[in-house]
């Protein structure tokens, strides 16, 4: 019998990054929070779908709150204390996600809205009828 070869897997290295950038991307259907170092390398991320929230509940402010809490926890495990917040998109979870980052223990130094605004580009989707 041949000797079994052990698989070597890379361990996640705990980085000590004091400040970073929180990118909050809110759409009408989901919220994605990515926390990066100042160079733009992802430290931690989370989304409503990744947390197991399904369907129309992904687009709620509560889902955005849980998402940013999970991302903030991962960032704080890597020694992060201060973040700049970049918010992109028109979704319902914008304010909830920012409030949740602060409640999780991260100090927010600046908030920027980086939502792309078209110079009358593509035709938008039809208005939903309730």
Swiss-Prot record:
The keyword Ribosomal protein applies. Keywords: Ribonucleoprotein, Ribosomal protein, RNA-binding, rRNA-binding. The keyword Ribonucleoprotein applies. NCBIfam families: PRK05309.1, uS11_bact. Part of the 30S ribosomal subunit. Interacts with proteins S7 and S18. Binds to IF-3. PANTHER family: 40S RIBOSOMAL PROTEIN S14/30S RIBOSOMAL PROTEIN S11. Belongs to the universal ribosomal protein uS11 family. This is Small ribosomal subunit protein uS11. It comes from Acholeplasma laidlawii (strain PG-8A). The lineage of its organism: Bacteria, Bacillati, Mycoplasmatota, Mollicutes, Acholeplasmatales. The gene is rpsK.
């Amino acid at each position: 019998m041949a000797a079994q070869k052990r698989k070597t897997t890379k361990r996640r290295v705990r980085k000590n990054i004091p400040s970073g950038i929180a990118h909050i991307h809110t759409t009408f259907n989901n919220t994605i929070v990515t926390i990066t170092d100042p160079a733009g390398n992802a430290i931690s991320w989370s989304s409503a779908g990744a947390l197991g929230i399904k369907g129309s509940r992904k687009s709620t402010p509560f889902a955005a709150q849980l998402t940013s809490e999970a991302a903030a926890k991962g960032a704080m495990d890597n020694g992060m204390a201060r973040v700049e917040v970049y918010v992109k998109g028109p979704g319902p979870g914008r304010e909830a996600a920012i409030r949740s980052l602060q409640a999780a223990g991260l100090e927010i130094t600046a908030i920027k809205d980086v939502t792309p605004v078209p110079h009358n580009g593509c035709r938008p989707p039809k208005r939903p009828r309730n």
